[in-house]
Curated annotation (Swiss-Prot):
The keyword Cell inner membrane applies. It holds the Pfam family DctM. The chain crosses the membrane at residues 9-29, 49-69, 99-119, 139-159, 172-192, 217-237, 242-262, 273-293, 302-322, 324-344, 366-386, 400-420. The lineage of its organism: Bacteria, Pseudomonadati, Pseudomonadota, Alphaproteobacteria, Rhodobacterales. GO terms for cellular component: plasma membrane. Signal peptide: none annotated. It comes from Ruegeria pomeroyi (strain ATCC 700808 / DSM 15171 / DSS-3). GO terms for molecular function: transmembrane transporter activity. This is Ectoine/5-hydroxyectoine TRAP transporter large permease protein UehC.
């Protein structure tokens, strides 16, 4: 049964069908093999509706909407300016500023695609003019934008939290440590690259200029305070923090900065609605698929066949990491989370792994796979945004992928990288 379900999904994917079709088809075929007729198909529909019922999913469209508003407005530009003013003058400062700006914008958007557009579009021309090779610039933007998938408000963590019934607030806090570690590694590599390639430094900003850019960026810097401070302080749930971010973004861009009209807001809302519809269809289809394979005990069959339960916690984490990394090299990250999390859930529970640690590792692997050839989705986002050939986008990625894989291995052996802040925030 498992072979039939997954073979059907693979064939449909290879034929080019949208991601939701293989999920629904796999669930439907599994349903027919279980019950033998169509008399109880309403059960599968009920499972799809149940999958999109959790209130925490409301945070997804809200964070997407807030990110789109900031991308079209001035918030992203103000964050870029303040980072450039403080670190742009050091060796590799422009590249370090790009990585830092991606991290800062990721901390208010949770979207890798929005980060590529908002940060990559204005900074790539400046980096090329400064003497950086385009292959390095593209790889830096793609991989630094993936930090947005790890640090709060990560949309990937929201989906994982819903599918696995794990605290989204704890996942958000756990992603901060690995995200900052990645930023440090990318910054160190940017410095080494600039030294080896004799990239000239940018002019040092005056203290008056730094103060001016800081004042301009104070309003956009309120987003992380709302998200992290609000959740940590017990003021907001993640869903409430998302709603507060939307309201804050609208007030900033429409009333304070006056960078968007009501017509712009309407266009942004339409775009968000389209993306949200796709995400929710995927989540609903994934819920039906998860119910079918769980009912048929497919996860137990697969995991029993490879003997994963005898590997111990470290071995299980390595298998999970490899599965999600490879999966996201070929398939959309949300689909990989929806399909594989239910498969590994029984063994995660049986070996006593912390679901927050597992979620952090999974989210990191999803981010790495999304930026890895041959079909990582972030690669094609960069191709579409910057109009550059595939070979040029992927040429500079190996050093970044190796650093990200190094962080994932460190997380497995030193879980406190992720769990220290979680334990501190939630007194565990």
């Amino acid at each position: 049964m498992a072979a039939t379900i997954f073979l059907t999904m693979i064939v449909l994917l290879l034929l080019g069908f949208p991601m939701m079709i293989p999920l629904i088809a796999g669930a439907f075929i599994g349903f027919l093999m279980l019950f033998g007729d169509l008399a109880r198909t309403e059960t599968m529909v009920q499972q799809m509706l149940a999958g999109i019922r959790p209130a925490s999913l409301i945070a997804v469209p809200m964070f997407i909407f807030a990110a789109d508003i900031m991308t079209r407005g001035q918030s992203a530009g103000r964050l870029i300016n303040v980072v450039m003013a403080y670190v742009g003058h050091i060796r590799g400062g422009l590249a370090i500023s790009t990585a830092a700006a991606c991290t800062m914008f990721g901390a208010v958007s949770g979207s890798t695609q929005a980060t590529v557009v908002a940060i990559g579009s204005p900074l790539r021309p400046r980096m090329l003019k400064a003497g950086y090779k385009d292959s390095f610039v593209l790889a830096l933007i793609v991989n630094a934008s993936d930090i947005a998938f790890l640090i709060p408000p990560s949309i990937g963590m929201i989906i994982y939290g819903v599918v696995s019934s794990t605290s989204i607030a704890e996942l958000f806090i756990a992603g901060i440590g690995p995200g900052l570690l990645i930023l440090v590694l990318f910054s160190a590599y940017a410095y080494i690259y600039a030294v080896r390639n004799d990239v000239p430094t940018e002019p040092r900003a005056s203290w008056a200029e730094r103060a001016r850019t800081m004042r301009q960026a104070l309003w956009p810097m309120g987003f992380p305070v709302i998200i992290i401070g609000g959740i940590y302080g017990g003021v907001f749930s993640p869903t409430e923090a998302a709603a507060a971010c939307v309201l804050y973004a609208l007030v900033l861009e429409v009333l304070v900065f006056r960078s968007m009209s009501l017509a712009d807001v309407y266009d942004t809302a339409k775009s968000t609605g389209l993306i949200t519809a796709i995400v929710f269809i995927l989540v609903g289809a994934g819920a039906a698929f998860s119910w079918v394979i769980s009912f048929a005990q497919v996860p137990q069959q697969i995991l029993g066949a490879i003997g994963i339960a005898e590997m111990g916690p470290i071995g299980v984490l390595f298998v999970i990491s490899i599965a999600f990394f490879i999966g996201c090299m070929f398939v959309d990250p949300i689909v990989v989370i929806l399909v594989l999390v239910p498969v590994f859930a029984p063994v995660v529970k049986s070996v006593g792994l912390d679901p927050v640690l597992v979620g952090t590792i999974i989210t990191l692997q999803v981010a790495i796979g999304s930026a890895t050839p041959p079909f990582g989705c972030d690669i094609f986002t960069a191709i579409a945004v910057f109009k550059r050939p595939y070979a040029e986008v992927v040429r500079g990625t190996p050093p970044f992928i190796l650093m990200l894989l190094g962080v994932s291995v460190a997380l497995i052996f030193f879980p406190q990288i992720a769990l220290f802040l979680r334990d501190l925030a939630f007194s565990k």
